[in-house]
């Protein structure tokens, strides 16, 4: 660690992104994410196979060539909005998991914050400004042709000299008080020479930095998208590529068995193929003849929530759906009740179904991967007093079973492609009458109460975010699923697995 002029008050800071704000100095896995999410499996594999070449270029100090090769393979032929979409919806989660809190402690104590990265600016800017509260982001600039496609080239000839010049232009006539850079002084941190004081990561815990009152935690990532669970380092990416053929076969077997076996038998058979269901609490008995059914109010983690609930109960419980694909409906082993988003019509549908028996509803209206619960719709509380809260959670190793940007019809397939998917179900006690609308409580009070007890059970936090908030952040729309023709759906499947034809 090198430190100069330790007494300087840090009102402005210029920090390198890779290896300083992020603990890991290697940006390869983030280009792999762009390749997979924006271009597809083939581009993902090509970039992985070029990793030894990229590593050799780095070792022999051809760092600009290594960077340009990564950028070219990951981005050529894409439209810039596709890269922006990945940077908005996918990358922030992986960046946040790698943020050095010691660096953040120093960075956040300064009033003016500048981030310098060798990656394309479009890949970093949104995260840096929204989550790290950076004022400026200096990175490489992608060249886009007149047809709107990225050429895979960048405007900078010498990336590090360009960064130095742009930092100097940003602080014309004055010097930034503090510079943060990689552990060793390299060409990529030559902008530190402009700073009155500079520190090399790792930042010491007892470093006396700036204005302590300005420190804030990074804005958490509540919504994120993308299919990959783990950051695709070269080793992880290779394992994923090797697993995919076996995963597809395993998913087909699991889905077939789920369709032909009795519901009560599925949890036992699933253990043979690596699945596991953990049940806590006491499930209620089926409703007696002539009595209205129980409304199971579940947290919403994946499309499989109501299906797994039916497996555990050993009987088919219809599920209220807000917006799912036709393929998901076809594959579902339980009946689905599609809502219209017209309040009176939906209320009548739910009441009618409850008169026949039990029903499952997920009042968040959409899934959330992080340990947060979205705002609960209060409609369910108006329609019945027989409410059983159910806390649902799941763990997967390779692939997420939800998407906001992709085709939802592949959600169950990706779920069953995981080697050892685990579901946890906790049945809470049925709400007492004094906690329902029958005692004079408002539907919103009941919904908020159910949200709180479910969040407490899972160790999650309650939020006021809605499905519209989620889809506006991740996909730039309101989350409505359109019903495509069979040809359009097949095109979507092909584009998911082979979208390298840009």
Swiss-Prot record:
Cellular component annotations (GO), alphabetically ordered: membrane
Residue ranges of the TM segments: 31-51, 237-257
Keywords for this protein: Acyltransferase, Lipid biosynthesis, Lipid metabolism, Membrane, Phospholipid biosynthesis, Phospholipid metabolism, Transferase, Transmembrane, Transmembrane helix
Reaction(s) this enzyme catalyzes, per UniProt: sn-glycerol 3-phosphate + an acyl-CoA = a 1-acyl-sn-glycero-3-phosphate + CoA
Keyword Metal-binding appears in the UniProt entry: no
Main location: membrane
GO biological process: CDP-diacylglycerol biosynthetic process; suberin biosynthetic process
E.C. code: 2.3.1.15
Pathways involved: Phospholipid metabolism; CDP-diacylglycerol biosynthesis; CDP-diacylglycerol from sn-glycerol 3-phosphate: step 1/3
Top-level lineage group: Eukaryota
Tissue-specific expression: Weakly or not expressed in roots, leaves, seedlings, developing siliques and flower buds.
Function comment: Esterifies acyl-group from acyl-ACP to the sn-1 position of glycerol-3-phosphate, an essential step in glycerolipid biosynthesis.
PANTHER family tied to this protein: ANCIENT UBIQUITOUS PROTEIN, GLYCEROL-3-PHOSPHATE ACYLTRANSFERASE 5-RELATED
Similarity field: Belongs to the GPAT/DAPAT family.
Name of the protein this chain belongs to: Glycerol-3-phosphate acyltransferase 5
Species of the source: Arabidopsis thaliana
Gene that specifies this protein: GPAT5
């Amino acid at each position: 660690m090198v430190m100069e002029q330790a007494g300087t008050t840090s009102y402005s800071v210029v920090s390198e992104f890779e290896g300083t704000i992020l603990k890991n100095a290697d940006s390869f896995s983030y280009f792999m994410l762009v390749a997979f999410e924006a271009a597809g499996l083939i581009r993902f594999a090509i970039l992985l196979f070029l990793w030894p070449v990229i590593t050799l270029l780095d070792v022999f100090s051809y760092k600009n060539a290594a960077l340009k090769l990564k950028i070219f393979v990951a981005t050529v032929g894409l439209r810039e909005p596709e890269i922006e979409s990945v940077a908005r919806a996918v990358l922030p989660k992986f960046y946040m998991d790698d943020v050095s809190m010691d660096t953040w402690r120093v960075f956040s104590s300064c009033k003016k914050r500048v981030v310098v990265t060798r990656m394309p600016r479009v890949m970093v800017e949104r995260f840096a400004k929204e989550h790290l509260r950076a004022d400026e982001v200096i990175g490489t600039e992608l060249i886009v042709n007149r047809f709107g496609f990225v050429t895979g080239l960048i405007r900078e000839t010498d990336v590090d000299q360009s960064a130095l010049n742009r930092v100097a232009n940003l602080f014309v006539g004055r010097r930034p008080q503090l510079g943060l850079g990689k552990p060793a002084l390299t060409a990529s941190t030559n902008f530190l020479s402009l700073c009155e004081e500079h520190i090399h990561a790792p930042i010491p815990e007892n470093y006396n930095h700036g204005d302590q009152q300005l420190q804030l935690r990074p804005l958490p990532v509540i919504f994120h998208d993308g299919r990959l669970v783990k950051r695709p380092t070269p080793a992880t990416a290779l394992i994923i590529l090797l697993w995919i053929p076996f995963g597809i076969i395993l998913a087909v077997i699991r889905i077939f068995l789920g369709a032909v076996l009795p519901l009560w038998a599925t949890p036992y058979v699933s253990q043979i193929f690596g699945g596991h269901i953990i049940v806590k609490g006491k499930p209620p008995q089926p409703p007696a003849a002539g009595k209205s059914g129980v409304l199971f109010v579940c947290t919403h983690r994946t499309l499989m929530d109501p299906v797994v609930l039916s497996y555990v109960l050993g009987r088919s419980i219809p599920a209220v759906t807000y917006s799912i694909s036709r393929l998901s409906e076809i594959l579902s082993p339980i009946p689905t009740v599609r809502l219209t988003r017209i309040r009176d019509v939906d209320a009548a549908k739910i009441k009618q179904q409850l008169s026949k028996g039990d029903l499952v509803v997920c009042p968040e209206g959409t899934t959330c991967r992080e340990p947060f619960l979205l705002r609960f719709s209060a409609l369910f509380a108006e329609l019945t007093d027989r409410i059983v809260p159910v806390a649902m959670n799941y763990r997967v190793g390779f692939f997420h079973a939800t998407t906001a940007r992709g085709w939802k019809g592949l959600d169950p397939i990706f779920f069953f492609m995981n080697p050892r998917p685990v579901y946890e179900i906790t049945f809470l006690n049925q709400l007492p009458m004094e906690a329902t609308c029958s005692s004079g409580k408002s539907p919103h009070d009941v919904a908020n109460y159910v949200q709180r007890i479910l969040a407490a059970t899972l160790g999650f936090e309650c939020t006021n975010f809605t499905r519209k908030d989620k889809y506006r952040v991740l996909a730039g729309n309101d989350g409505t699923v359109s019903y495509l023709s069979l040809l359009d759906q097949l095109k979507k499947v092909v584009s998911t697995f082979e979208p390298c034809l840009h």
